[in-house]
Each structure stands twice: as C-alpha cells, then as structure tokens.
C-alpha cells in the first residue's frame, strides 16, 4: 500500500509531523497508530475483495467504525498539540516582554538629513539614531520620544503635558525662540515647540474673543507651559484668573425692558451712542467723546440694566451703520466683578486691571465697541487714604487713572461705573476727562412706577374672571386698572404707609413713607409675590387668574418685611446708601403699625454699620 493510501483518513499535516516537532513518546504512539490503521485498511480491502463472500457485512461495518474512531482520535490529538504550541509561543512572548530592559524618554531637539536626531535626555543633549520604523521627517521639535537600552529612538510620543508656568515676555526675531519670565521674575530663553511655532500663522484673536482656550497667535503676557531643563515651551495655558473676573457677553437687555428711566436713558444714549454712530460730526466740531460714565443712585433702581442695554443698543446701531445683519451685531460688555479684583498679594489687583484694559484695547482696535462695566465701583476705587485695614486703594486708583487717560489712549472703549456710594469714590476718577458723564438713577415716582409695573404685568398673564367681568372682558383695560390701583396704594401718604421718622442735626423732623424707599427691584418683588399668591389660590380653590387683591396683599407683605431693615446704629450712613442726602440724621424712629417706639436710637460712634436696605 502506498504512502498516500496510508495517510488517507488522517488530518492534514499529520503525515508530515515527525520527531522534529514531537517528543519521542508522541512519535512512537503516532507510528503505532499508523501501523494499526494500515493493518485495518488491509483487512478491509481483503474483506471487500474477490473473496468478500466469505466475510459477513457486519465485520465490514465494525472495521469502518474503528477506522472512523481512530481518525477522530488522531484529529483531537492534533488539535491538542496545536493549542499547546500556541500557548507555548504566547508564554515565550510574555517572558520576552517581561525581560525587556527599561526604556528612557527624551525631548526631541532637532532632526538631521542623515536620519539622526538630537535628543535631550537625563540632563544631557545627545545625538541618536532612529529605529527603521520611525519616520524622521514626521518628528516635530519638542516632541517626546522613547529610547531603548541602546539609546535608539524606537517610538514617537506626544508633547509634554506637565511642567512649570512662565509668562511670555516677547518672541525673538527668528520666530522659534521666546523670552519668558518664570518664578521669582527669572528670565530665560526657551525654544517654542512645533504647535506654538505654527500658532504664528493663526489670527490674532479667536472668533469669540474672550474664549481664551481657543487657538490664536501668541502675544506678550500669555502663560506658557515650559520644561526649564529641556528649554522648551509646549503649550499656551488659558488665563482662568482673568476669565473669572471678566464676563464677556452681548447682553439681550434692550431699553424697552427698562421702565421709569426715560430721561436717564436719553442721557446715556447721547453720551455713548452718538460718538460711535456720528464720528464725522464729532470730528467736524472737534468734540472729544466721553471716556466714561458714572451711574449712581440707590440700590435696585436699574443701574446694571442700563449698562447692559447700552451694549445691546450700541451693537445694533453699529450693525445698521455698517449694513450688517442686526441679529449678528457684536459688541463686548465686560462686567468686572469689582470685589473679586481685590487680592491679598501686592500688585495683583493692578495687574488684573492692566490685563483687562489691554485686551479691551486690542479688540476695540478692530472697530468693535467695547464697554468696560465696573459694578460696585466704590469697593475698589474708593478715596485714597480712607482705608481702615489696608491702603490698597493708593495704588489701585492710580492704575485705573493711567489706563483711562494715560499715554495709551482708549479708542472705541467706554468705561461705565455703577455705585450707590458715589461719595466714597476717589475724586480724581470723577473729574471731567475720565468719567465725564454722571447720571443719577433716582427712585421711581408714581408715574415711573406705573411704567415699571407695565413691564411685569403684561396682557399675556392669566387674569381672574371676576376682575375681567368688571371691565367687560377687556384684558388690557383690566391690567391698566390693576396697575393704577396698586400704584395709588403704594404711593398714598396714609398712616399704613408711614415708614420712618427722622430727626436731623438741626432738630427738624420728617416723616418718610415707603414710597420714599421704593425701587424697581421692590416693584418686581411685589409682582412676583402676587403671582405666587395667584398660584396658591389655584391650588387651594381651583380659581385661576391674578387678582387686584393679590397685588394689594403683596404690597402689605413687602412693606412688613422691610420694617426692621433701617440701620438705627448709624442712620446717616444708612441714609446715604438709601439715597437720602442732605442734613445729617441723628435719630431714626420706625413708624410701622404695631411697631413699638423703642426702636428710636441716637447715632453713636460704633463702627458696625449693621444691615443696609
């Protein structure tokens, strides 16, 4: 019988398996199986030969079954051997991996035409070769590379992500090096990594200017991630410290959203919008536009709202002049959180002010109006020499003065300040040429209060059916009557509305009513309280809609909440914040119904200013 005939019935590859790949025991067993299979095949051939009549059919089937069994056993053995071989290879790879020597890392400094590279590693600058699988032309300066035990570059990594923070002073003429200032004002020259070199071709500002995390061209003052040992700067780090203090937005507040301040709105539009919209006329008349505006007055009367509306209106008007789409109008409203500018480290507050104005100038140079709004201006720019626990104002105020009208001019930048203690702001800031325009935001009178109420009580609000019936279902007329009635109640000089009796230093006495301390914020609070009562009424009775009684009850509750707020410890300071100026106040007595007369107290020298209204 031929070799091919002997191999029939065995798995592929079995016939070629010899002692070279199997142990001696396995080879002997395979040889025995071969001989037995050959013998069985020979018996089978004899059984089906010319003398097959002497064999029974059952013997033939038994032989065939035995051959099949041997073939299956042979196949199973081959699978086991293959699996064992694969496991052996995997274990060998694991042993080789665990036995590899440690790899080092370095920073790529330069590449050369002969496929060698300069690498900084372990404090040394070395010229190394690269593995054949490394594309030297694709390597970038400043990139991290992995080295084997023979100091051959075997893998390219990313740029370093940790290191020291340094401030960029200037980029040198070659464009690949920069002067940076590190810890303790230490100056050093560093190389710029490839991403920073490529940033030279980017626009000077991102589309959203104050999104400092977006790629843009480097400029002095930027914070850079630096590896001082390798001498490389890898990345520009966004200045979160300034972003926390500056809120950049295009406000959505318009003049139509402000009630009761028509005269003040006209004043600020004349001061801010006219110079931007009619530059030619101002130039023809040699008229210099104002550099700043001060909004002062009692709390809650709309100073911040007006500042936001200025930015919104100015952006739209500029878009109209340029022929742009008003919906895409752009202006920048920098809302400076005044108290957060203060820092315990000497010079930090001044540095923040410099950065804010530097960035405002850069954006304004493109012709886009920039409004810098200082809220609570008295907190950081108070009169020099009046500090109790610190003298920080002696350096902060001069910094602002130099920014507003120093050697560097302010073009397309308007400074708006807001304060309810304008008497505490340094006079040098308030003089003409700095904050030129001073606009007093007064407390609303009855007419202004009706205008403010109309902003919150609109015709789309649900009104109770009984109130609508009185006006034959005319919703507009019903709302108007509600406003008139609630304003009459709020501004009536009746005993229920008496608030305080003040005694001046000259002995004169004056009764003050709640209307003397009204504000836009209080009116909004009254309306919100009435809406809450209407909601509770729906839940309790099922009757839906706002009623005039809800508004009247809200006025009573609002007045009751404010009866304990006047500061009787130092009434003169309290009166200044509340908007009452003039003769010095020495006594305050609350006149709210049900309040005892023991609340009267003389002014004394205590430094505690107490609760302000």
Swiss-Prot record:
Coiled-coil segments: 23-100
Cross-linked sites for Isoglutamyl lysine isopeptide (Lys-Gln) (interchain with Q-Cter in protein Pup): 595
Pathway(s) the chain acts in: Protein degradation; proteasomal Pup-dependent pathway
Assigned keywords, A-Z: ATP-binding, Chaperone, Coiled coil, Isopeptide bond, Nucleotide-binding, Proteasome, Ubl conjugation
Positions with a binding annotation for ATP: 300-305
Any one GO MF annotation of this record: ATP hydrolysis activity
Gene Ontology cellular-component terms listed: proteasome complex
Record-level GO BP terms: modification-dependent protein catabolic process; proteasomal protein catabolic process
ATP-binding in keyword set: yes
Location of the region described as Disordered in the Swiss-Prot/TrEMBL record: 1-29
Entry-linked Gene3D superfamilies: 1.10.8.60, 1.20.5.170, Nucleic acid-binding proteins, P-loop containing nucleotide triphosphate hydrolases
Database matches in SUPFAM superfamilies: P-loop containing nucleoside triphosphate hydrolases
Top-level taxon: Bacteria
Positions of region (Docks into pockets in the proteasome alpha-ring): 612-613
InterPro entries named among the record's database cross-references: AAA+_ATPase (IPR003593), AAA_ATPase_domain (IPR050168), ATPase_AAA_core (IPR003959), ATPase_AAA_CS (IPR003960), NA-bd_OB-fold (IPR012340), P-loop_NTPase (IPR027417), Prot_ATP_ID_OB_2nd (IPR032501), Prot_ATP_ID_OB_N (IPR041626)
Protein's job: ATPase which is responsible for recognizing, binding, unfolding and translocation of pupylated proteins into the bacterial 20S proteasome core particle. May be essential for opening the gate of the 20S proteasome via an interaction with its C-terminus, thereby allowing substrate entry and access to the site of proteolysis. Thus, the C-termini of the proteasomal ATPase may function like a 'key in a lock' to induce gate opening and therefore regulate proteolysis.
Assembly and oligomerization: Homohexamer. Assembles into a hexameric ring structure that caps the 20S proteasome core. Strongly interacts with the prokaryotic ubiquitin-like protein Pup through a hydrophobic interface; the interacting region of ARC lies in its N-terminal coiled-coil domain. There is one Pup binding site per ARC hexamer ring. Upon ATP-binding, the C-terminus of ARC interacts with the alpha-rings of the proteasome core, possibly by binding to the intersubunit pockets.
PANTHER family: AAA-FAMILY ATPASE, PROTEASOME-ASSOCIATED ATPASE
Annotated domain remarks: Consists of three main regions, an N-terminal coiled-coil domain that binds to protein Pup and functions as a docking station, an interdomain involved in ARC hexamerization, and a C-terminal ATPase domain of the AAA type.
Family to which the UniProt record says this protein belongs: Belongs to the AAA ATPase family.
Protein name (record): Proteasome-associated ATPase
Organism: Mycolicibacterium smegmatis (strain ATCC 700084 / mc(2)155) (Mycobacterium smegmatis)
């Amino acid at each position: 019988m031929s070799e091919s005939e002997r191999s029939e019935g065995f798995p592929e590859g079995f016939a070629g398996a010899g002692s070279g790949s199997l142990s001696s025991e396995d080879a002997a067993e395979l040889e025995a199986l071969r001989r037995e299979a050959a013998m069985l095949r020979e018996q089978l051939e004899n059984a089906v030969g010319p003398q097959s009549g002497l064999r029974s059919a059952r013997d033939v089937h038994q032989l065939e079954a035995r051959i099949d069994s041997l073939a299956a056993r042979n196949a199973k053995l081959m699978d086991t051997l293959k699996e064992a071989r694969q496991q052996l290879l995997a274990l060998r790879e694991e042993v080789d991996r665990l036995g590899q020597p440690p790899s080092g890392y370095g920073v790529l400094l330069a590449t050369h035409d002969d496929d060698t590279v300069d690498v900084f590693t372990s404090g040394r600058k070395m010229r190394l070769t690269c593995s054949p699988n490394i594309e030297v032309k694709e390597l970038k300066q400043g990139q991290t590379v992995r080295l084997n035990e023979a100091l051959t570059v075997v893998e390219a990594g990313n740029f370093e992500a940790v290191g020291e923070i340094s401030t960029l002073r200037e980029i040198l003429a070659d464009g690949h090096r920069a002067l940076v200032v590190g810890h303790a004002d230490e100056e050093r020259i560093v190389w710029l990594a490839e991403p920073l070199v490529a940033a030279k071709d980017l626009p000077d500002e991102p589309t959203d200017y104050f999104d400092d995390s977006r790629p843009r061209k480097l400029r002095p003052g930027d914070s850079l991630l630096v590896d001082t040992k390798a001498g490389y700067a890898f990345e520009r780090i966004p200045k979160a410290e300034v972003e926390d203090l500056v809120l950049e937005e295009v406000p959505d507040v318009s003049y139509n959203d402000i009630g009761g301040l028509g005269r003040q709105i006209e004043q600020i539009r004349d001061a801010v919008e006219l110079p931007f919209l009619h530059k030619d006329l101002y130039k023809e008349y040699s008229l210099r536009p104002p550099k700043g505006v001060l909004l002062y007055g009692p709390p809650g009367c709309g100073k911040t709202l007006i500042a936001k509306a200025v930015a919104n209106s100015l952006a739209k008007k500029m878009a109209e002049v340029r022929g742009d789409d008003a919906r895409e109008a752009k202006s920048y409203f920098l809302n400076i959180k005044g108290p957060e500018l203060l820092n315990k480290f000497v010079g930090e507050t001044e540095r923040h002010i410099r950065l804010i104005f530097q960035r405002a100038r850069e954006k304004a140079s493109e012709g886009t109006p920039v409004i810098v709004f200082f809220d609570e201006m008295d907190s950081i720019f108070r009169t020099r020499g009046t500090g109790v626990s610190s003298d920080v104002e002696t350096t902060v105020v001069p910094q602002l003065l130099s920014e507003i009208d120093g050697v560097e001019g302010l073009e397309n930048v308007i400074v708006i300040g807001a304060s309810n203690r304008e008497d505490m702001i340094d006079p040098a800031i308030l003089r003409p040429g700095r904050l030129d325009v001073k606009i007093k935001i007064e407390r609303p009178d009855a007419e202004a209060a009706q205008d403010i109420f109309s902003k919150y009580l609109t015709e789309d609000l649900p009104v109770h059916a009984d109130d609508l019936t009185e006006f034959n279902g005319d919703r507009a007329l019903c709302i108007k009557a509600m406003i008139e009635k609630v304003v009459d109640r709020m501004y009536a000089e009746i005993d229920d509305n008496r608030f305080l009796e003040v005694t001046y230093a000259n002995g004169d006495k004056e009764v003050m009513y709640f209307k003397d301390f009204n504000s836009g914020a209080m009116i909004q609070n009254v309306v919100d309280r009435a809406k809450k009562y209407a909601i509770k009424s729906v839940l309790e009775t099922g009757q839906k809609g706002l009623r005039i009684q809800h508004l009247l009850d809200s006025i009573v509750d609002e007045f009751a909440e404010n009866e304990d707020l006047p500061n009787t410890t130092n009434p003169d300071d309290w009166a200044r914040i509340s908007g009452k100026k003039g003769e010095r106040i020495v006594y305050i007595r609350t006149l709210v119904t049900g309040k005892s007369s023991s609340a009267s107290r003389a002014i004394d020298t205590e430094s505690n200013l107490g609760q302000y209204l």
